């Protein structure tokens, strides 16, 4: 069964979707209660536009795996069969970053594939104008890929993340003063008027509505403090769940939210964040200043 799934994934990556479909169907014939086989078959059907069949597969995946580590409910939301959740479900996110943590540092070395950290670095350095060392929060710090960039500027450097696997990697580099395994909203609600700069690299892609998290970030910043962050760009709606199950937001949405909270946009740059299955993922990098 595993061999058929591996073959199906290889064929899918090669664009041989009909052959991949046959391979996943064979896996299901051999083991009908294998959630990953139904999920992968659903992705094939979704890709070729057989949405009703895709829905059946994702519903079956949920039936077999109620914890939904694979993200079947999010797939159903992209097909209009579920309400888009306010945030990336924790079970899915933990599984996602558990896999990512094993090769994240290698991915970030491949700047032809992943450029998110470089874009944040440029935004931070372009707008940093404080001669003294500052208090920095690396929000959703992951494995700590930005720590070596931020450390020379930091009086204190704090990292917060929800993934234990990512935080273990961040601990190994010994560049943070403190690391916390906490929900970001919970952590922010516990600190007020504390940070000179808050960094959120590929973090807001896990939040559908940004009103509350922006309010908490503003409250956690000192006056004239800066918020450096990236979003995946959405061009059709104000906010959306994209095809690879992350949230995207429009420039108008961010601008309106910043205006409402009296956060001044001092930097904005559109660029390619990364490549997902050979497709470019457009992003916007911002720096907002608390007035």
Describe the residue ranges of each PLM region.
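A short glycine-rich, Lys/Arg-flanked "PGG" loop and its adjoining helix->strand segment in the class I
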Residues: 211-226
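Residue-level recognition of tetratricopeptide repeat
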Residues: 34, 68-69
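Conserved alpha-helical positions within TPR/SEL1-like repeat arrays
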Residues: 2-13, 36-43
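Class I SAM-dependent methyltransferase SAM/SAH-binding core
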Residues: 142-187
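Acceptor-substrate binding/catalytic loop of class I
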Residues: 237-252
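A conserved beta-strand element that flanks and buttresses the S-adenosyl-L-methionine
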Residues: 199-200
